[in-house]
Regions:
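Active-site mouth of glycoside hydrolases
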Residues: 2-171, 176-185, 193-195
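Active site of divalent-metal-dependent phosphoester/diester hydrolases
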Residues: 301
Length: 301
C-alpha cells in the first residue's frame, strides 16, 4: 500500500503534457489544427456504441473492428510525428462491453477477461517502440459494483503484466473504479510496478458538467440551469470545492510518487460558468503537475 512508483528518465523528465481527447477518426486537418493549438498529447479513443448495453460480445467481429481502428491509428501516428504530438492509446470499448447496470462484462466472464489481455498483447506487439505512443491506457472508466472474479484492479494488473513482458518501456495507464472517479482513489492501491501513470476523470459535480445532456432540458420542462460557481444541492461549488473533490487523487500522488493524468474533464457548452469551471480545474491540475487532455476535440463530427 506504500509502494513508491519510479519512472525512467524519459518519463520523469517530461514536462507537463497538455492536450485533448481525440475525434473518432482523424483527418489531416485535425492534426494540423492540433499542431497550431500547440497540443502535445492526444488521448486516442478506440470506441463505438458509447452508452449502449451488451455490445462487443462477438469477439471475432470485435477483433475485425479493432484491427481497422489500429490500422487507422498507425497511419495517424506516422503523420503526427512531424508535429511532435504524443498519443495515449485508449481502449474505450473493451471486449464484452457493459451490461445494463454499466458494469463491464469482462469483470465477471472469463472469456472476455482473457480476450482483454490478448487484445493488449496485440497492441503492445504492434506499437512497441513507436515514438508517437506515450502510454497504453488499459480500459476507459471501469465500473464494478459487485464482487467479481476478475475485478477492475486485478484485471488491469494482469493486462499490465502481460504488456510488460512484451514492451518493458512504454508507460501503462491505470484507471480507478466508479467511472475513473476521483472519489475512488480513496481505495485505489498502486500496482507493484514502475512506470505506471494513474488516470482520473473530472466531471464533478455532474449536475453542472452534464446538465441537459441527452435533451433532458426539454424533457424536464425547462428547469433552471445550474450555474458555477454556486450552490448545487447541499454544496457550494467553487475552485476550493473542486480542489476538495480532487484531494484523494492528490493524496495518492504524494503517497506513491505517482504521475497523474487527467484523461477527461469538461463541462457542456451551455452550462453557465463553464469557462470559469474549466479555468479552475486547469489551474489546479497545473499547480499539482498533472498531465491533462480535455474532452473532447471534434468528437461529434
Amino acid at each position: 500500500r506504500d509502494y513508491k512508483v519510479s519512472y525512467p528518465e524519459r518519463v520523469a523528465s517530461m514536462p507537463l503534457l497538455r492536450g485533448v481527447m481525440s475525434p473518432h477518426k482523424f483527418t489531416d486537418d485535425d492534426l494540423e489544427t492540433l499542431h497550431k493549438w500547440n497540443v502535445k498529447l492526444v488521448r486516442a479513443q478506440i470506441t463505438r456504441d458509447w452508452g449502449k448495453a451488451n455490445t462487443d460480445r462477438d469477439l471475432a467481429e470485435y477483433d475485425r473492428w479493432l484491427d481497422g481502428k489500429l490500422d487507422h491509428l498507425e497511419e495517424v501516428f506516422k503523420k503526427a510525428r512531424k508535429y511532435g504530438i504524443l498519443f495515449v492509446i485508449d481502449l474505450h470499448s473493451p471486449p464484452g462491453g457493459r451490461d445494463e447496470t454499466r458494469d463491464m462484462h469482462m469483470f465477471y466472464d472469463k472469456k472476455y477477461a482473457d480476450h482483454f489481455i490478448k487484445v493488449w498483447q496485440r497492441i503492445a506487439r504492434r506499437f512497441k517502440g513507436n515514438p508517437s505512443v506515450w502510454a497504453y491506457d488499459l480500459v476507459n472508466e471501469p465500473v464494478q459494483t459487485r464482487p467479481a472474479p476478475y475485478d477492475y484492479w486485478n484485471l488491469q494488473r494482469m493486462a499490465a503484466e502481460a504488456v510488460r513482458r512484451i514492451d518493458p518501456d512504454t508507460p501503462i495507464v491505470i484507471e480507478s473504479n466508479e467511472w475513473d472517479s476521483p472519489v475512488a482513489f480513496r481505495y485505489l492501491s498502486p500496482l507493484a510496478m514502475d512506470n505506471v501513470i494513474y488516470q482520473v476523470h473530472m466531471y464533478h459535480p455532474g449536475q453542472f458538467t452534464h446538465q441537459f445532456v441527452g435533451n433532458s432540458y426539454g424533457e424536464q420542462g425547462k428547469r433552471d440551469f445550474v450555474r458555477y460557481p454556486g450552490k448545487m444541492g447541499s454544496e457550494y461549488w467553487d475552485k476550493e470545492m473542486i480542489r476538495k473533490r480532487l484531494q484523494a487523487v492528490r493524496d495518492f500522488q504524494k503517497r506513491h510518487n505517482a504521475r497523474i493524468f487527467v484523461g477527461e474533464f469538461s463541462a457542456i457548452l451551455w452550462a453557465p460558468g463553464a469557462a470559469d469551471y474549466l479555468r479552475d480545474c486547469i489551474e489546479i491540475f497545473e499547480e499539482y503537475g498533472w498531465d491533462w487532455t480535455y474532452h473532447a476535440f471534434r468528437e461529434s463530427k
